[in-house]
A protein has these predicted regions:
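Cell-wall polysaccharide-cleaving catalytic domain and substrate-binding groove, primarily
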Residues: 1-141
Length: 141
């Protein structure tokens, strides 16, 4: 298993509180979901790990933590300040990492393309302006 960072482990309970457990709501384009992980993503994870496909309803703590770490935390959150990392992580799990980047770009007022350009806005913008803007946007901390 991955060697998770202290910040990831500190933020994880907040995201899990939002994500809850298993759901398969009619009309939800993601279909069957458990801990915010859709069936297709779980299938890919298990295939890559050399494991047989099974229902996302059976996902283990080790599996969802590994998916959160690799797909939602590690690509961008280590570069963000505390608080902002949690908000970004939560948005990424709820709507995908590209959507999370677009929301951050939108609130800062830079070109919205879904590709993170931290140097475009500078560390101060990502840590203070975005933190304040995300609070106004209604993002949880």
């Amino acid at each position: 298993m991955a060697d998770f960072s202290p910040r990831f482990l500190a933020c994880l309970p907040f995201v899990l509180k939002e994500e809850g457990g298993y759901s398969n709501t009619p009309g939800d384009h993601g279909g069957a979901t458990n801990f915010g992980i859709i069936q297709a993503e779980y299938n890919s994870f298990r295939h890559f790990a050399g494991l047989p496909v099974q229902s996302v309803k059976l996902i283990t703590k080790d599996e969802y933590r590994a998916i959160y770490w690799a797909s939602y935390w590690n690509p961008h959150c280590p570069d963000l300040s505390p608080g902002l990392d949690l908000s970004f992580f939560n948005i990424a799990v709820n709507g995908g990492p590209v959507r999370a980047v677009k929301i951050l770009q939108q609130v800062v007022g830079v070109s919205v393309d879904g590709e993170p350009h931290l140097n475009d806005v500078g560390a101060a913008a990502w840590s203070s302006v975005m933190y304040t803007s995300l609070i106004a946007y209604g993002a949880p901390f």
